[in-house]
Swiss-Prot record:
UniProt motif ('HIGH' region) ranges: 121-131
EC number: 6.1.1.19
Subcellular location, record wording: Cytoplasm
Signal peptide annotation: none
Organism whose genome encodes this protein: Streptococcus pyogenes serotype M18 (strain MGAS8232)
Protein name, as recorded: Arginine--tRNA ligase
Subunit field text: Monomer.
Amino acid sequence: MDTKTLIASEIAKVVPELEQDAIFNLLETPKNSDMGDLAFPAFSLAKVLRKAPQMIASELAEQIDESQFEKVVAVGPYINFFLDKAKISSQVLEQVITAGSDYAQQDEGQGRNVAIDMSSPNIAKPFSIGHLRSTVIGDSLAHIFAKMGYQPVKINHLGDWGKQFGMLIVAYKKWGDEAAVQAHPIDELLKLYVRINAEAETDPTIDEEAREWFRKLEDGDKEATELWQWFRDESLLEFNRLYDQLHVTFDSYNGEAFYNDKMDEVLDLLEAKNLLVESKGAQVVNLEKYGIEHPALIKKSDGATLYITRDLAAALYRKRTYDFAKSVYVVGNEQAAHFKQLKAVLKEMGYDWSDDMTHVAFGLVTKGGAKLSTRKGNVILLEPTVAEAINRAASQIEAKNPNLADKEAVAHAVGVGAIKFYDLKTDRMNGYDFDLEAMVSFEGETGPYVQYAHARIQSILRKADFTPSATTTYSLADAESWEIIKLIQDFPRIIKRTSDNFEPSIMAKFAINLAQSFNKYYAHTRILDDNSERDNRLALCYATATVLKEALRLLGVDAPNEM
């Protein structure tokens, strides 16, 4: 039990007027540590008990069982709790040393599935930094959900269908060179895609031609299908090479095309429930009762189905296949209206499990303040960016530790980790400006800074030749150790908050705080001095490294033992 919960439970025993959760939320951290570790304001009880807050605080402080604390005192209208630091540090260190990387493992999920729709790049387009956010946020959430006891199912809902394939076929037939595409598939396909879009702005016949080729593709035309399959296969080879570099895996690559034969059922269900309404020749579902002004456009006047129809089919398929406890869509914030409509249509169809679906939205990545766009050729490609990050990491490692063994593997972990961490430390609803130099810096709130703190601790433990014993009692009571102990003790709550809010930045900020607290401790403490506290200090180092490594793992970032 963490200290806040302990205090709330002890207060609840003498204050039946308030629920324990309400007490928990009222607890404050005094600005001055001389006033205690946590304080409960008695103002909230003044009306109920019809007494002055000072009197309430004084009376309750007398009734609270002090055996769990160093002391409990009333100061004005507050009850101030001074924690038994030696006792709590002993408990926390024992828990981490005993559990190792399983420390803070929780069982909320009880093995139930969480479907995570993530990454989902478009076939025949390069994997850009714009796709990175969905990939790394989704991957981190998968680790977090597993830590909460769920079974994550990572789905790469590939953009492998749509009018853009009509455009690409037109471009390839006009200017394509098979040998060039085979040699550099994505580069060549991108050039064709950008060129055809530029021409389409002045030549309206291109759009019609593209629509015609896409209609052929929908009808199973041999030439169209073979070209589509070729574009898809070449793109996937390139994507998988990048996913390997990022250490990201998937459980399903069912993309948009997978649902082509599953949309008729959606239309039949909507018709059977009398939900389809005709509007200007199109078929729509009205959603005004859900506060959604625009109806969901299900089928256009020319009979073509739309993106939402496909997503309805995907939602039904995933519920039947995975029976998910949660279904998460890690997709940019610009799709917010679409996902509101999707959930509302499913609700109208009578599927209450739509309440278990969440759009995990995120802000844009910009470069020099400008929005990125594949169509306009203004794009930061991930592959060369990862290579440059690894090179920058390698240069810094060479300068700091030229004799390091396995430099290439460490540079890869630091370079890739830097890009991921920088993305994840940003509140997901906020965008960020892409700055590789800032990402790979060993100073500031960065991945390499946290990784370096972990590597530094491993170096200390190697020098001391120290491995903690699960049967030894370790404890510390000094102020700087206490700051670290409090953070380590808070780790289970941080995991739950990250999970509840679908917000990996909570975990990233925790990792930064823990690394900063340890570095402060390291600067002010002679850890290896041979005195009676040495093993206690080393046990704290061991616990800190264990939690730092696990926090980084939950972000999808490796923690090298040497840097």
